Every structure is written in structure tokens, then in C-alpha cells.
């Protein structure tokens, strides 16, 4: 009947979450610095988010060391994911795919590697679950995209793309042109 009962578990989750976030930012900053010879604040912040996403699946099962490892690897995965999307010429201006998809997959699988019930069986459960959820999401998205495409299309015209969607949709720019060199 007491609200404070079990707060030790809450504090543990808070600590593992904060450690993973810090390690994600640090991992992304160091890795992107080594890779690009440049420290980029957006890569650092996406690394923090990658660390947070990575630890979410197992924050209750990890100790501080595991949280730091999962967060740092999550941050590095974000940097590699951004590079992969750039190489594939896929547009993701805020890095949502590397942060949420790639670091999320890592965090889900990491439960099977580092969690309280880690082991081969748990790893396989995490891997299979990730595949099942991924397949469901891909199939659902394709169905929705096909419906939207048949009703109104999925792309804007090249002219609208060049002008910028803020200008076309809202008749003004949400960012001044000096922000992006226009």
C-alpha cells in the first residue's frame, strides 16, 4: 500500500537509461570524429537518442556496464546507419531510421545477449521476435503505401521538391533561406 515500495527498481532503470544515453552520445561523437575527422552535434544528439532507444527493451534487466556497452554500440550504429542511408541515397534528414530502426533492432537483440535471462534461447527469441515484427511492419506499410499511392500519389512534383514543401504547402518557409544556403 506504499507508493515508495519498489523504488529501487525504478532507480536502477533510471540509472541504466541515463548511462546508455550518455554512452550513446559519446560513442557516436568519438566514432563520427574518427570516421569524418569532425565532431558533429547532430550526430552526438542522435547518438544519445540511439543509446536511449537501444536500452529501452532491457533497461530493467541490465546493470551499469551492460547499459554503457549497449548505449555506446547504439550510438555507433546510428553513425553507421546515417552513412548507409547516405550511400543508398535515402532521404532521412533527421536520422530517424538509424535512431529508431537500427538502434531499436540492436536494443531488442541485446536483451538476448546481456539481459537477466541472456543465452542462446533468449537471443533466438529476441531475433525471431524482431523478424516477425519487422515483417508485419513492412507488409502493413506496403499495403498502406499502395492505397495512398492509388488515391493521391506518394511523391511531389520535381518543381515542388526544388521550391521546398514549406513554400508550396504553407506559402512561406519555416526556416530562413540563410539556414540552408538558399
Residue locations for each model-derived region?
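Single conserved hydrophobic/aromatic residue that forms the stacking wall/gate
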Residues: 1-11, 172, 177-182
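Cytoplasmic-side transmembrane-helix entry/capping segments in multi-pass membrane proteins
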Residues: 39-48, 95-98
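Transmembrane alpha-helical segments of multi-pass membrane transport proteins and ion-pumping complexes
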Residues: 20-33, 48-55, 59, 71-83, ...
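Structural signal for the N-terminal portions of transmembrane helices
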Residues: 9, 13, 118-135
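Helix-coil boundary and interhelical linker segments in multi-pass alpha-helical membrane proteins
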Residues: 5, 9, 56-65
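Structural signature of hydrophobic alpha-helical transmembrane segments
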Residues: 12-21, 65-73
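Membrane-helix interface "capping/anchor" motifs
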Residues: 33-42, 87-92
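Extramembrane terminal tails and long inter-domain/linker segments of multi-pass membrane proteins
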Residues: 150-173
